[in-house]
């Protein structure tokens, strides 16, 4: 006679199973388990009197025989491809299997072999996501990296050299000398890092030397002069060397309007930063570019989501970040031209329908590096409350909306920047850059962050206590963040061209240098998973009202948000 358990008892012991629903933090977002890859009655679980013991759930297999290095048991995976319950097997710092873990000598259907050399991470009742990627980083201070890691980010792409005024305003590392220093500095950090060179030039020579010097992308920024000539030149170099181009267009419309920038792009693939415009770009209608099939549009998180405080904080932020003076009327006019409640409200809806593809931070330069996940899920929650369930949802859940929003800071930036063969999702063969969450703290405070299969960060109690949990509990680096484990657990992404000319040997860095690939004609807006809509966008030049395919896009600002003061004292 099979043993029967109530759903509540089963979920308490092994985590939710098919058909069970889980609330994400304090939002109105509810996910439903679509499939359970574990086997009822043969689940593996670690602990006293539990299954993963010698001769039971643990086999005699050696590592050579196929035993994994780490098993995450009974995890609820939330990814762009599905919301499923499964065990996850990690080996050599990569995901090698998703399915049923255990001992094949005593259990059927095992595709993840647990052996004496296998570590166990208890995933029961936990959510596992791919590590987040922030593709809009101003490398103003190295302390950003710890902040990002502790929030669940495992890859940061952008530019800068520290608190130089060029870096305070623009996301680029100018010149091969600075790029080399940043790649060397990357060895010190438990984080996958990637650096963009400056893309503003009318002749290719200086851009080519940056790509050959290790830049994995080129950034066009209006503060360096984003003219049609610079746009064309930069994209031509990118096409030759297979690196992505990110663009921040001309707010003042000095060298042309949005149509001129679209013309200069000539249908080539490009990542458009803060496409709404508050972060910069042709005023007031840069948002129109999100309807172009070759443009990958993204947001930075200060405008995510639209709240009663959004407009008020932006003016001061903008004055500081772009080296403007409140005593110069032209500087104030420049700042005010970028801040429009109508386009910010429309941005919420464009994210919800999948027309904006990526959310990033704009770290310390009109953005908060530790709030990429929080702002993403706050936007999703606001849209559910204001717009209801997505028409594409099936069942009494928010699975489709959750898949759409998690893709915005995991797989889609990875695809856009040529990293998706390594990171961005929980798939076999990819790096084991994973984040484990308690559902009540989902998107806010991770339980554990893994880099290349090693635990790099986690909340930890008093090190002198008799158990790990006594106060003060706060985030601390773990062993994966120290010594050679740090440089063996994370990587630096560069151009293939730089590797071909011997960059690794020339710099002698400890981290592995990996090449970006397929950033040009092989991808487009259509490549953005769950976020590929290309509506025709119109902006009224006087009222700033935004329409998509003729429909007015507007919503009220939020007065209260989830994932906020309930979780933070400060």
UniProtKB/Swiss-Prot annotation:
Gene3D superfamilies named in the record: Metal-dependent hydrolases (3.20.20.140), Urease, subunit C, domain 1 (2.30.40.10)
Active site: 322 (proton donor)
Metabolic or biological pathway: Nitrogen metabolism; urea degradation; CO(2) and NH(3) from urea (urease route): step 1/1
Name assigned to this protein: Urease subunit alpha
Family membership: Belongs to the metallo-dependent hydrolases superfamily. Urease alpha subunit family.
Gene Ontology CC terms, in alphabetical order: cytoplasm
UniProt main location, coarse: cytoplasm
Class of enzymatic activity (EC top level): hydrolase
PANTHER family to which the protein is assigned, alphabetical: UREASE
Enzyme Commission number(s) from the entry: 3.5.1.5
HAMAP family: Urease_alpha
Higher taxonomy: Bacteria, Pseudomonadati, Pseudomonadota, Alphaproteobacteria, Hyphomicrobiales
Residues annotated as binding Ni(2+) 1: 136, 138, 219, 362
Binding-site positions, Ni(2+) 2: 219, 248, 274
Gene that encodes it: ureC
Catalytic activity: urea + 2 H2O + H(+) = hydrogencarbonate + 2 NH4(+)
Molecular function terms from GO: nickel cation binding; urease activity
Protein's organism: Allorhizobium ampelinum (strain ATCC BAA-846 / DSM 112012 / S4) (Agrobacterium vitis (strain S4))
Co-factor requirement: Ni cation
Subunit description: Heterotrimer of UreA (gamma), UreB (beta) and UreC (alpha) subunits. Three heterotrimers associate to form the active enzyme.
Key words of the record: Cytoplasm, Hydrolase, Metal-binding, Nickel
Domain Urease: 131-570
Description of post-translational modifications: Carboxylation allows a single lysine to coordinate two nickel ions.
Cofactor binding summary note: Binds 2 nickel ions per subunit.
